[in-house]
């Protein structure tokens, strides 16, 4: 620990989100995106190398991280990601929300594979949780925002 004590982020806890989230249409199909999670994993690696304890909340990705300073929580949906972020948000010094979270999910998820019975399929969608908006509602002060589009 005496070696880590000289690092700039030693003693800090950072929460980072990474990757996509997927929203099930039925047991074999989902709404998702092509986010790789690479940016979030690189941010986690960098923060850990600078001495931080990192909580990494990742959607489905092939990225891996090998660091005893990173605790990874694998999630699938926007709701699952929100739940883990909510659980840890009040205990961290900083949060970087870099995941590509789905904006919408099917209002109803079919319990079995949807069969091709007609020429078209109509899906009704509803908004997912806005993670940043929801954590701000907890009354936790968010002092600095950096939005990158």
Question: Which residues does each predicted region cover?
Answer:
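Glycine-rich phosphate/diphosphate-binding loop of Rossmann-like nucleotide-binding domains
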Residues: 8-77
């Amino acid at each position: 620990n005496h070696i880590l004590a000289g690092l700039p982020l030693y003693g800090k806890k950072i929460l980072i989100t990474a990757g996509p989230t997927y929203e099930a249409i039925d047991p074999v199909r989902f709404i998702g995106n092509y986010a790789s999670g690479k940016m979030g994993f690189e941010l986690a690696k960098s923060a850990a190398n600078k001495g931080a304890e990192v909580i990494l909340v990742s959607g489905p990705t092939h990225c891996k991280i090998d660091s005893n300073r990173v605790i990874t929580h694998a999630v699938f949906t926007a709701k699952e990601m929100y739940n883990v972020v909510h659980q840890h948000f009040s205990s961290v010094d900083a949060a970087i929300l870099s995941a590509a979270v789905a904006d919408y999910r099917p209002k109803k998820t079919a319990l079995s594979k949807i069969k091709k019975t007609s020429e078209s399929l109509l899906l009704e969608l509803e908004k997912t949780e806005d993670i940043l908006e929801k954590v701000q509602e907890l009354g936790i002060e968010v002092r600095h925002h950096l939005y990158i589009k």
